[in-house]
């Protein structure tokens, strides 16, 4: 899949909420500690934002004029899944050619980006010990990719 996806606002519902044609979904393993779930979520979503800067909204500013960084301009759904469901979602994302960020168990033992890439590169895609992933693409494709996962509590 090329990097040409853009977030399109498809329509407004009667309540005024914006609906999107694209979706960002994060899956985290259901056996992780809370701090690990948060860490994985932050890392994999940063990959989506880095690869697709058009997803970022405008910078924020408070009433005092203090500037803040832009955030993703569309919602992110965070889901949990067991190891088998996560592995299946990974395979479906690859099959659909959806942009994806991954986090493996080995990455918890590293201390920087180069080491993270090294531990991922050392394992074939079918043998990755995935503990999380983020996927972005057309809403229906993402929904089919994360089938079987549950909303994170």
Residue ranges and their predicted role:
Residues 2-153:
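Positively charged, small/polar-rich N-terminal and surface patches that mediate targeting and assembly
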